[in-house]
Design a protein with these regions (language model features):
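Residues that scaffold the ATP/ADP-binding catalytic core of kinase and kinase-like folds
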Residues: 101, 154, 162-163, 214, ...
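Non-catalytic connector elements of ABC transporters
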Residues: 167, 171, 180-285
């Protein structure tokens, strides 16, 4: 890896416990015989400042928090100025607060060093917040390559749509019927479905933001009988069932008082609504 110009950082940090922070960062440079000790230590201090651990140079790994240890591991990986930095689930061992902090730090470090960085993660939030481009894999096969927002807004298939998004996208089985989607007793008109053959089995994907409450002067696409509602921070979500599947949508403040059992007329927005082939998972609309 060293000869290929690749720096590695893993989730377990892999720091030498008997060495100080300074010695750990300097260690990859020891093989450079032409590099004087003062130059190695200057490089170590430069990297320590980059990852903001310069005040911890004389401490050993056992005296550092998990986040601090990961910063040192990144500094050590950057010591030899690699062409590529590979981060293999580097935040898995950190608690939620530190993960958020380190996500921001890794993004900053990459932007300051301009080193091409490959970040391996199973966490969609990490992928979406850190990356310029996401490669989404399933069973070793590439499902989609796109910028984070494009991946969210324009999923290539059912797997991509269900992998990204919190709360997750709601998937309802349906059938194309006379240019519309029939799901159970409900029929929904969706632009683009009219081009699909009658009787085709599909999956209807609805993100929380895809539904809004219909105004009094307009027709509704669906009538939701509210099963429950709950609050996540500043957002209120209501839950109803469509052909036995749970569907969620955001409640505006003016009707946040609705109760279980109430009927609410809904309209589909122009975004967050997808139609997938039920067998292949390919996105159709």
């Amino acid at each position: 890896m060293e000869k290929r110009g690749v720096g590695l950082v893993f989730q377990n940090y892999s720091l030498y416990p008997h060495m100080t922070v300074r010695q750990n960062i300097c260690f990859p440079l020891e093989s450079r015989k032409e590099m004087k000790k003062t130059a190695r230590e200057a490089r170590a201090l430069e990297l320590a400042k980059l990852v903001r651990v310069e005040e911890l140079m004389d401490r050993r790994p056992g005296q550092l928090s998990g986040g601090q240890q990961q910063r040192v591991a990144i500094a050590r990986a950057l010591a030899k100025e690699p062409r590529i930095l590979l981060l293999d689930e580097p935040l898995s061992n950190l608690d939620a607060r530190l993960r958020l902090e380190m996500r921001e730090e890794i993004r900053r470090i990459q932007q300051e060093t301009h080193v091409t960085t490959v970040f391996v993660t199973h966490d969609q939030e990490e992928a979406m917040s850190i990356s310029d481009e996401v490669v989404l894999l399933k069973d070793g096969r590439v499902q989609q390559v796109a910028a984070p927002q494009v991946l969210y807004d324009e999923p290539a298939n059912l797997f991509a749509a269900t992998f990204l998004g919190t709360p997750p996208i709601c998937i309802v089985n349906g059938v194309v019927e006379n240019g519309m989607v029939r799901a159970g007793e409900d029929t929904v008109c969706i632009a683009g479905v009219e081009t699909l053959e009658n009787g085709r089995s599909i999956c209807l994907g609805l993100r929380c933001e895809s539904l809004r409450v219909a105004r009094a002067d307009e027709a509704s696409d669906l009538t939701a009988v509210i099963r429950s509602k709950y609050v996540i921070g500043r957002d209120a979500l209501a839950i109803f069932e469509l052909d036995g599947q749970i569907v969620r949508f955001y409640l505006p403040e003016e009707i946040a008082h609705i109760a279980e059992g109430d009927s609410v007329p809904l309209r589909l927005r122009n975004k967050g609504v997808y139609v997938f082939d039920r067998e292949s998972g390919e996105r159709l609309v």
